[in-house]
Amino acid sequence: MIYHVAKTGNDNNTGSEKNPFLTISKATQTAHSGDTVIVHEGEYRECVSPVFSGDSAYERITYTSADGEKVIIKGSEVIKGWKKEEGTWKVEIDNEFFGEYNPYTTTIDGDWLMSPIDKFLHTGAVYVYDSALKEVADESELLESTWYTEQKDGKTVIYANFGGYDPNQGITEINVRQSCFYPKETGVNYITVRGFEMAHAATPWAPPTADQPGLIGPHWSKGWIIEDNIIHDSRCCGISLGKEISTGHNPAVNFGRKSGYQYQLETVFRAVQAGWCKEKIGSHIVRNNTIYDCGQNGIVGNHGGAFSEIYENHIYNIGNRQEFFGFEIAGIKLHAAIDTHIHHNVIHDCFWGTWLDWQAQGARLSSNIYFDNIDKDLWLEVTHGPLMVDNNIFASKKNFTNNVQGAAFVNNIFAGTTQYYSVLDRSTPYHFPHSTAVAGCAAMYSGDNRYYNNIFCGKDADGWKAGTDYYNGYSASLKEYLECVHTHGRGDIDIFMREKQPVYINNNCYLDEAQPFDREETNINTKQASNISVTMENGKIHLEIMLPEEFDDLKPYGIKTETLAKPRICELPFENADGTPIEINTDMLGKPYRNTIGPISKLKSGNNRVLIWSAQ
């Protein structure tokens, strides 16, 4: 059955093409497995909450915009009645207007939020022609393009400094709904959402120990497809593949009886007991979306994003306004990305690019382009492998915070620097293969990583290193490492903590002032200037890099399951998410490799200028 929604419709209609519904929400009460809801051009100010599930990946419920028609779903309302007072404007709104959720009494707070915590900001926002003003915590701070809110006599009062703009004459909007497309209940499976612009959601701070609503998301379900959408101006999170509330909600802030780490560890086991498994949760597809201007994340998720595929998304301007800050901000921030494949995304101008935290077992980060990110491109934290990072270009000044063991870094360009550290005071879980079942917990000892066929550029700066020489002094085989461990006699975890795990490093190219691991047998080590740049102009991204004469003679190390040492802790092979052997034999553009290293097969000695991405 096909249902239609149009601004000319009526919710008492049948939903046919000639007699469409007025709201998408009405269609959610009618559409069942196998049905399609076609939404026609216009602006829909509602939170769409699907009621029914599809029966399978082949019998899903599809919500889509009509071909060639622009459909916008907004979590905001246009607000008139602003009154000018001494250079600023004020509007008073009865709190009943907001219903059950008032973004101007709901603060941005939760576990791992670090600032501001003296005067909290709010999940609401004020927009002028789709451009968000900045919230300030005190009325005295109302400079141009800022706003402030307070409660008076059962009313929400908003003060704003619009400069020379009259908010009653143009389009001035405020957030009023938490989400744009998000089920109220969990377990609404096999939904497709395609072709919408969605904006202005009053989403809350979403750490891994809390309920994690986004502007759009499946809300702890299975098999969603979110594709071909434009998603922007979510106060915190754009797309959420996150956990739900029953397994904990900001316990560190709300109770404080234990560390956030301990609560997060408990969340893992609570999730398993609550039914977190491949058969029920995850396996989502997020593709070909444009996501920008969100305060915390473009894509976020703890547990709920496992077994998913995230690809061909363009993500930018995430967390870059820095109105608030905490340790959960990134273009993509996932915990427990088990068997999740993140590939062919373009991520730039974010505070942090991609952050995979805890349990990224079986994950693959492939063929992504990072540049102009504020702090760094990639953070891999307290996870034990196997984790494959291949065919990526990391082109910001700071590339990578390395707090991972059991990973393979293959055919990448690292154009900047790396920060490296171990974590011996936190043990995090690892799992049985391709499963959420917990197999054990371990500290992050450092080492046990593999680097083959990469190109390193840049020079050391601010305590961060260019190249792989921060591994100098590490052993180069498991046999050697274990011999060192057992020289300490019989013991337990203490003797393993005294030694650094082995690293497997070969066939890399080092340019500028980048330096190799001192036991790397085959490499190119030259101080030749790389002149590397990644630039975007007119919707096209080009890579430019100068490579030395020796580059054409360095043959790549063959990357497949049998040539990669198993991670020591989890003792599992590098393989595809379906359990088949993995082999890296194509570049980031999908071309077969031709005896070259790096992410692009046609790289050669001399100056290279390569088109690596073009907007559709």
Question: Across the structure, where does each feature detected by a protein language model lie?
Answer:
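Extracellular polysaccharide-degrading/modifying enzymes targeting complex plant/algal/animal polysaccharides
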Residues: 4-220, 230-232, 240, 246-276, ...
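Right-handed parallel beta-helix
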Residues: 189-202, 222-236, 248-271, 277-297, ...
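Beta-rich catalytic cores
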Residues: 212, 295, 328
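Short beta-alpha connecting loops at secondary-structure transitions
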Residues: 330, 376-378, 395-400, 433-440, ...
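Solvent-exposed loop and edge beta-strand segments that line ligand/cofactor-binding
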Residues: 354-356, 377-380, 440-443
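Non-catalytic carbohydrate-binding regions of carbohydrate-active enzymes
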Residues: 410-432, 456-461, 465-485, 515
